[in-house]
Amino acid sequence: MTRLRARVGELLDEYGIPSAVLGVLRDGEVAGFAVGVADVSTGQPATTDTIYQCGSMTKTWTALAFMQLVDERKVDLDEPVRTYLPGFRVADPEVSATVTPRHLLYHTSGIEEDFGDPGEDDDVYERMVAGIAGAAQVHPLGYTHGYSAALGYAILARIMEVLDGKRWDTIMSDRLLRPLGLTGTTTWRAQVDRRRAATGHLIRSREEGPVVTPVDHLPRCFGPGGNVNSTIRDVLTTAHVFLNAGKAPDGTSILSAAGIREMMRSRVPLPDPYMFGPAWALGLIVCDWHGETVYASDGSTIGQNARLRIMPDSNIAIALLTNGGPRETFYKTVFNELLTDLHATTIPDLPQPDRAADLDLSRYEGVYGRPGTRYEVAAEGGKLHLTLTLDPMQAQFLGKPDRVRYELLPVSRTHFLMPSDDPFEDTQTVAIYDFTQGGAQYLHTNCRVNPRLG
């Protein structure tokens, strides 16, 4: 990997990323390397033992532990949540009575992430579930995919707590971390060995370069959906379970082969198939790489990013952990160079815009959003533009104006590319769809669904 190590070093400089750790699991063997520094303010070198925040990759671990309860027949994916949490209630009575764990794993519950501040104590997930009685629906139950960063998996965690009689952090240690030998992996900030931990960084301009983030961790309420910290080896050890019918590297059974198949094969379609893939499975994203099915688990926190790709047909898993910079462009470049060296299938490029697309632009125009997010889509000069309104504090944090305008380039009747003028911002993909009432009813980007507001 000598050539690739040098290449990653060049890319770190190009993208303003302090460090990256790249690893590959092939035929049961792990190899990898680290380049750069864990913290620009100290100059501490990154190593393959450096601990990074994994963000929403956490959901794969939580789903794996939840599926153990399915194996044990303690829970049924298609039974209402109320079967296990009798007092469960959101604003919609029908959703309260019928939403299931499968809806939560699929991100199709439609429940708004309206849970207030449940605090940092051990009962945080119990408090979250108790505090959502007024949570409204973003969309009807099961109608479309709309990513839930924290709430959906917090409800799953509370089910786990009730059935196991322990707090979620203890459950994860008992069910996964210890049996898998994940000695560098933890589920909340207080457990992290700070001497080994990477620091998150932001980059607002090439002149300034990467700077340490002013907020160094997510709140505890994100735990089951985003608070795992891990090393490259531990991430790939977890991937081993999916490539080997539920078995750990030492042969320990983590989940039945049937449970692994269910996690991979139970799927719901994604409105936007281009950023990740065409479907969402149970704790995994389903990708189509030139006809080869690949499973993804991704995560980002404030200034840290984690990417995992599992390739059952090739018996390969690859992972990348970074502490800053753009996400998609960097990881795709690094992964494709690694995959080329491995003579494996590479990641497809985003589609090209259809310059000849004949669209009725008025059907897309409108305001879409959810609490804290607002998108305005407008036609001008025969083109569609999207204006994102940022919270003033978020704009200051990112070094951006309060309103950011993008052109939407059509790929199809419902899909668009959204390139940025900012060299440190990735091109996004956008789906605008559901014309049952004339104008589009939903805008889906970065996995989040935003209903029409006006």
What kind of region is each of these model predictions?
Residues 5-9, 22, 28-30, 51-81, ...:
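Active-site SXXK
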Residues 16-19, 302-305, 373:
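Short, small/polar residue-rich loop motifs at catalytic or cofactor-binding pockets
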Residues 1-54, 74-76, 90-91, 125-136, ...:
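Short, conserved catalytic-motif segment at the N-terminal edge
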Residues 77-92, 180:
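Short, glycine/proline-biased beta-turn/loop segments that scaffold the active-site neighborhood
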Residues 313, 329-454:
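Peripheral terminal and inter-domain segments
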Residues 296-298, 307-324, 443-445:
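Short, well-ordered beta-strand elements
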Residues 29-35, 39-40, 92-302, 307:
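Short, surface-exposed loop or secondary-structure junction motifs
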Residues 4, 54, 58, 62, ...:
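Hydrophobic (often cysteine-bearing) scaffold residues that line and stabilize catalytic clefts
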